[in-house]
From Swiss-Prot:
Enzyme Commission designation: 7.1.2.2
Organism classification: Eukaryota, Viridiplantae, Streptophyta, Embryophyta, Tracheophyta
Protein name according to UniProt: ATP synthase subunit alpha, chloroplastic
PANTHER family for this protein: ATP SYNTHASE SUBUNIT ALPHA, MITOCHONDRIAL
The reaction(s) this protein catalyses: ATP + H2O + 4 H(+)(in) = ADP + phosphate + 5 H(+)(out)
HAMAP family, A to Z: ATP_synth_alpha_bact
KW Membrane (keyword) present: yes
PROSITE patterns, A to Z: ATPASE_ALPHA_BETA
Gene: atpA
Length: 501
């Protein structure tokens, strides 16, 4: 009896010895030396990597940004109010990543891709790194497809292509966000995914944008990533990279995406705050030395992919705010040098009632007519030149008392052209409507119409063509060319409308 009991015990002991795992699990840990202002200094964490996520005892997560000889500087992804001096921290061995899926369409999320619209969790099956490398030279192809904004001034003279980075720059309250939201509204039915990233904006401004998109049915193809002004600097710093990761998910699935960063100057300010608190040496305007790299690595992820990768695209519209028109400040010049052109919005034009307040003279698209359909190239070719000559003449005419007839005619034509470029907010126009408008203006058909009546005449002409002569729209949409037949139909419609007007 005693022997069998002893055998059982020895068998159990033998089994336990066999099952014993001799592997030692090494955990990279450290101790909090100091915490405050969204920054923690950690002693230990000897093997931590730059950019690695670290986890505090009470659950807060941070990113190791400064690796110094005696300690590690960590930025907190939260308020960190429960972190105490002396508490333990462990390195996770991971870098920041977010879940991605089709389920994000129509949702409002924060910089960690967590929903903040109160509509429940988002089901996801895979994840992407927040910071992923930009496509290489071989992975890209040149921009050739237009991305229509619905704004005549942009689509005719400063065209944007799929895969381009076009900066929207101007003083505060000049309609920069309105240009971006109008572009989103114009993508309805284009099978294009839009991502709007709000960095350090007022919560009321973000709510207004979301409401506009919902009312117009644009939220179903849009994702809003929002970190408002009261968010920690770390989350404001991460928000644009999160937006880029979400857009990349669709781009690599052979889809077209549009991402709007509103705005990188607030992003740079959040990064400056983090850097100064981490005691990194300040440079120009107290920004750290790598603030150019901050934006270049973000905007270089924008691409038109090669046919081997499925020809997906990601187009970016960063919005930068200037102080009293000073485009030579640090952040504006940085972003101008990274992007493929800029749309300059002028406070003077805005106050003069010219909206969108686009200064066509100093706005430029470095992709140019490659991002226009043939029909638009045919009619819009001389529009920019005529407007430039008009602006020059107008400045001269202020000092001249008696002008000859030709100059007076050119001034009158210019005033009518400028009237054509005015558009109401949230009322984007189709390419066909834009072609009608530009052709009518540049071919002297409006010279006999009073300036105050120009917009009314054009609206009626567009409606007349849509209802009475639908063949015009069919020709443009099917051939993408302003054919002789289309021109004949348009001329006929203008004559008929002139008689009715």
């Amino acid at each position: 009896m005693v022997t069998s009991r002893a055998d059982e015990i020895s068998q159990i002991i033998r089994k336990r010895i066999e099952q014993y795992n001799t592997e030692v699990k090494i955990v990279n840990t450290g101790t909090v030396l100091q915490v405050g202002d969204g920054i923690a200094r950690i002693y230990g964490l000897d093997d931590v990597m730059a950019g690695e996520l670290v986890e505090f005892k009470e659950g807060t997560v941070g990113i190791a940004l400064n690796l110094e000889s005696k300690n590690v500087g960590v930025v907190l992804m939260g308020d960190g109010l429960m972190i105490q001096e002396g508490s333990s921290v462990k390195a996770t061995g991971r870098i920041a990543q977010i879940p991605v899926s089709e389920g994000y369409l129509g949702r409002v999320v924060n910089a960690l891709a967590k929903p903040i619209d109160g509509r429940g969790e988002i089901s996801t099956s895979e994840s992407r790194l927040i910071e992923s490398p930009a496509p290489g030279i071989i992975s890209r192809r040149s921009v050739y497809e237009p991305l229509q904004t619905g704004l005549i001034a942009i689509d005719s003279m400063i065209p944007i292509g799929r895969g381009q980075r076009e900066l929207i720059i101007g003083d505060r309250q000049t309609g920069k966000t309105a240009v971006a939201t109008d572009t989103i509204l114009n993508q309805q039915g284009q099978n294009l995914v839009c991502v709007y990233v709000a960095i350090g904006q007022k919560a009321s401004s973000v709510a207004q944008v979301v409401t506009t998109l919902q009312e117009r049915g644009a939220m179903e193809y849009t994702i809003v990533v929002a970190e408002t002004a009261d968010s920690p600097a770390t989350l404001q710093y991460l928000a644009p990279y999160t937006g880029a990761a979400l857009a990349e998910y669709f781009m690599y699935r052979e889809r077209h995406t549009l991402i709007i960063y509103d705005d990188p100057s607030k992003h740079a300010q959040a990064y400056r705050q983090m850097s100064l608190l981490l005691r990194r040496p300040p440079g120009r305007e107290a920004y750290p030395g790598d603030v150019f790299y901050l934006h270049s690595r973000l905007l270089e992820r924008v691409a038109k992919l090669s046919s081997q990768l499925g020809e997906g695209s990601m187009t970016a519209l960063p919005i930068v705010e200037t102080q009293s028109g000073d485009v030579s400040a640090y952040i504006p010049t940085n972003v101008i040098s990274i992007t493929d052109g800029q749309i300059f919005l002028s406070a003077d034009l805005f106050n003069a009632g010219i909206r969108p307040a686009i200064n066509v003279g100093i706005s430029v698209s470095r992709v140019g007519s490659a991002a226009q359909i043939k029909a638009m190239k045919q009619v819009a070719g001389k529009l920019k030149l005529e407007l430039a000559q008009f602006a020059e003449l107008e400045a001269f005419a202020q000092f001249a008392s008696d002008l000859d007839k030709a100059t007076q005619n050119q001034l009158a034509r210019g005033q009518r052209l400028r009237e054509l470029l005015k558009q109401s907010q949230s009322a984007p126009l189709t390419v066909e409507e834009q072609i009608i408008t530009i052709y009518t203006g540049t071919n002297s058909y409006l010279d006999s119409v009073e300036i105050a009546q120009v917009r009314k005449f054009i609206v009626e002409l567009r409606a007349y063509l849509k209802t009475k002569k639908p063949k015009f729209n069919e020709i443009i949409s099917s051939t993408k060319t302003f054919t002789g037949e289309a021109e004949a139909i348009l001329k006929e419609a203008i004559q008929e409308q002139m008689e009715l007007f």
